[in-house]
Structure formats: C-alpha cells, structure tokens
Amino acid sequence: MTTVNQLVRNARPTKTFKSNVPALGACPQKRGVCVRVYTTTPKKPNSALRKVCRVRLTNGLEVTSYIGGEGHNLQEHASILIRGGRVKDLPGVRYHVVRGALDCAGVHSRKKSRSKYGTKQPKS
C-alpha cells in the first residue's frame, strides 16, 4: 500500500478511456454516403445474410455499418445517418444505420418498436 508521501510525489495515473465508436468523434450520429451495399455472413454458430454497407463519413473516414430491419432501399451514393452500436456476430461492424433519416426509409409495416425503425404511426 502506498503512503501519503509516495502519492504526493507521484500521483496515481488516470485510466484512459478508449471509444468503441472512434469514427463518430464526440458526436451522437454522423452523416455519410454509401460506397457499397452488400450482404455478409455472421460468425459461428449463426447463419444468415446480414445487410451491411460501407459508408464514407463527412469527416473522411470509411466505416462498415449495419442496416437493421426487414428490407431496405439503400443503394450506392445514398446519403445516410449512422449511430454507434456494434453487431455481435459481424466482426468489424461497429455502427448502425439510422432508419427513417435522410435517404434511408423506415421499415414498412412495422407495428412494434416503431421508433427504432423509423416507421410512422399507422392510420387506425
């Protein structure tokens, strides 16, 4: 255990924080342009074709972003908004596309958790 004199001479080092979403800087979301839209397969033991896109952000960085929900309208050169949030079974995917913002349409015929998928309230 350290003494008071030792702490006065040499203070304890502060722990450095490492961001999980470095491309966003300190921003909650960032705008970008789709460079490539494609599907990829997840790690074992899962099996699917996950929809992802390569995005060039306004700060010049290029990241891979996941497109959540059933179906999407994204093509190359589409302007999209991305947020942080990794996909556990896709290595290297640390960002999500915000559905219902800019060129990305919301999920059609979504009834529950609509706000997460950019779906308007259905006409009753």
UniProtKB/Swiss-Prot annotation:
<dbReference type="GO" id="GO:0015935">
    <property type="term" value="C:small ribosomal subunit"/>
</dbReference>
<dbReference type="GO" id="GO:0003735">
    <property type="term" value="F:structural constituent of ribosome"/>
</dbReference>
<keyword id="KW-0488">Methylation</keyword>
<comment type="similarity">
    <text>Belongs to the universal ribosomal protein uS12 family.</text>
</comment>
<keyword id="KW-0699">rRNA-binding</keyword>
<comment type="subunit">
    <text>Part of the 30S ribosomal subunit. Contacts proteins S8 and S17. May interact with IF1 in the 30S initiation complex.</text>
</comment>
<dbReference type="GO" id="GO:0000049">
    <property type="term" value="F:tRNA binding"/>
</dbReference>
<keyword id="KW-0694">RNA-binding</keyword>
<keyword id="KW-0689">Ribosomal protein</keyword>
<comment type="function">
    <text>Interacts with and stabilizes bases of the 16S rRNA that are involved in tRNA selection in the A site and with the mRNA backbone. Located at the interface of the 30S and 50S subunits, it traverses the body of the 30S subunit contacting proteins on the other side and probably holding the rRNA structure together. The combined cluster of proteins S8, S12 and S17 appears to hold together the shoulder and platform of the 30S subunit.</text>
</comment>
<dbReference type="InterPro" id="IPR005679">
    <property type="entry name" value="Ribosomal_uS12_bac"/>
</dbReference>
<feature type="modified residue" description="3-methylthioaspartic acid">
    <location>
        <position position="89"/>
    </location>
</feature>
<dbReference type="GO" id="GO:0019843">
    <property type="term" value="F:rRNA binding"/>
</dbReference>
<protein>
    <recommendedName>
        <fullName>Small ribosomal subunit protein uS12</fullName>
    </recommendedName>
</protein>
<dbReference type="InterPro" id="IPR006032">
    <property type="entry name" value="Ribosomal_uS12"/>
</dbReference>
<keyword id="KW-0820">tRNA-binding</keyword>
<dbReference type="InterPro" id="IPR012340">
    <property type="entry name" value="NA-bd_OB-fold"/>
</dbReference>
<dbReference type="GO" id="GO:0006412">
    <property type="term" value="P:translation"/>
</dbReference>
<keyword id="KW-0687">Ribonucleoprotein</keyword>
<dbReference type="Pfam" id="PF00164">
    <property type="entry name" value="Ribosom_S12_S23"/>
</dbReference>
<comment type="function">
    <text>With S4 and S5 plays an important role in translational accuracy.</text>
</comment>
